[in-house]
Amino acid sequence: MSSRLSGLLDRAAGKRVLCIGDVMLDRFIYGVVDRISPEAPVPVLRHSREASMPGGAANVARNLASLGLEPVLIGACGDDDAGRELLSIFDQDLSLSVRLVTAKGRPTTLKCRFVAGGHQLLRVDTENVAPVSEATEEELIGILSREAPGSAAILISDYAKGLLTDRLLKAVTKLAADLNIPLIADPKGRDFARYGAVDILKPNAFELSAAVHRSISTDEEAALALREALDTLPAKAIIVTRAARGISYIGQDGNVHHEAGRAREVFDVSGAGDTSLAALATAIAGGGTLSDAVHLAIAASGIAVGKAGTATVSAEEIKAALSVAGPVGRAGLLPMDAMIGQVERWRAAGLKIGFTNGCFDILHPGHIRVIEQARAHCDRLVVGLNSDNSVKRLKGPLRPINNEQARADVLSALSAVDGVIIFDTDTPLDAIAALNPDVLVKGGDYTRESIVGADIVEARGGEIVIVPLVAGHSTTAIIARSETGK
């Protein structure tokens, strides 16, 4: 299966896919909470940094680009600060073709999340969910008609923010049918019939439950709900995402299948549905079956939920995750060339890149402290891991205790780690020079002058962070205690 899915990713590369839907700006305000307000029983967030990125249908398009396809994003934004910020982000991202209509008098949908310690404290939404004007509909239909020919798939990403009117949905459905283009819809609300004869309808469990007025907690209940929905809808197939329970789906043959998710510690579910939608389209664009599409979506979303913010997933990450069986996977371990490309995509999205390194032979609280502190100073954290040969040269012939693959697997499973690379040199200097992180973090009694790569990072305006050691915790001490029993 893994080689088949990897082949689909390769065949889908460069294919043109249209994505139409509600475009929004996702803003994350990060800080620290260490006291309660004297004015009211609410936490006080001490602001540290902010990050903004395209969300909704725009995040679907970003995921398509990250997976190697050529997306065309079609939607609308307002003539306001949030809309201008979105357009500015798009101007810097050459992987997307953006066709946005400016809806006069209508705000750009903005979701502002306040985050501390990896947890969302509050979300503030700015939006107008009324249907867009007839003039906006006309512009969008015209764009669709011009852009659709030659596309490998069309995606509908509905967040119920007013863009996907009944008229626009009918136009999309007719266009896809006339041009024989696969049509995939991520619906919102209870009325699934309004999406017409789509090839794949992808609700989540809550949406499907509301549409059929039936609980779907178990596989049996999910099967009943899927059969009932398919019997009453013109859709050819329905896929329901069920969070930790994985995905259940039904095709035209009426058979229901259940696929377990790829277990991984969940850090943030923001945008995971967008990632799975993009993966479905990628599989279809690559000539895959419904089953292929489901398995690729599971692999992609399993990686996405292990990342903070509205995250994208690359083809290289999926291939790495597919290459190893088991619950941990290797979604974070990439060859250096692939990691350089991933870092470039993160940076193009306006994300702050952090780097730390070490042998991480036997993971202990001191390691965890450094990694968590490193992640607190950036949006995406890459960990450089000394290879087995490098550890032997530095620590002696009896080290490492755990080989590089085992150490990489453990690091990749941590929610604070977004990527892992293995370097064979004695220092990470070459890796730092190649990745150009914005933040370089080191644990221990270091000075700025003694940290390898500090000059490279500071030369491009980056930050150096030194995390104090946790007393009594080191791999050497753990090994000594195991030998003496003390």
Swiss-Prot record:
Enzyme class: transferase
Catalyzed reactions: D-glycero-beta-D-manno-heptose 7-phosphate + ATP = D-glycero-beta-D-manno-heptose 1,7-bisphosphate + ADP + H(+); D-glycero-beta-D-manno-heptose 1-phosphate + ATP + H(+) = ADP-D-glycero-beta-D-manno-heptose + diphosphate
Gene3D superfamilies on file: 3.40.1190.20, HUPs (3.40.50.620)
A Pfam family matched in the record: PfkB
GO MF terms, alphabetically ordered: ATP binding; heptose 7-phosphate kinase activity; heptose-1-phosphate adenylyltransferase activity; phosphotransferase activity, alcohol group as acceptor
GO cellular component terms, A-Z: cytosol
InterPro entries (UniProt xref): Bifunc_HldE, Carboh/pur_kinase_PfkB_CS, Cyt_trans-like, PfkB_dom, RfaE_dom_I, RfaE_dom_II, Ribokinase-like, Rossmann-like_a/b/a_fold
Pathway: Nucleotide-sugar biosynthesis; ADP-L-glycero-beta-D-manno-heptose biosynthesis; ADP-L-glycero-beta-D-manno-heptose from D-glycero-beta-D-manno-heptose 7-phosphate: step 1/4; Nucleotide-sugar biosynthesis; ADP-L-glycero-beta-D-manno-heptose biosynthesis; ADP-L-glycero-beta-D-manno-heptose from D-glycero-beta-D-manno-heptose 7-phosphate: step 3/4
Keywords: ATP-binding, Carbohydrate metabolism, Kinase, Multifunctional enzyme, Nucleotide-binding, Nucleotidyltransferase, Transferase
Segments for region (Cytidylyltransferase): 355-486
Assigned EC number: 2.7.1.167, 2.7.7.70
PANTHER family xref list: BIFUNCTIONAL PROTEIN HLDE
HAMAP family linked: HldE
Assembly mode: Homodimer.
Family assignment from sequence similarity: In the N-terminal section; belongs to the carbohydrate kinase PfkB family.
Protein name: Bifunctional protein HldE
Naturally occurring in which organism (per UniProt): Hyphomonas neptunium (strain ATCC 15444)
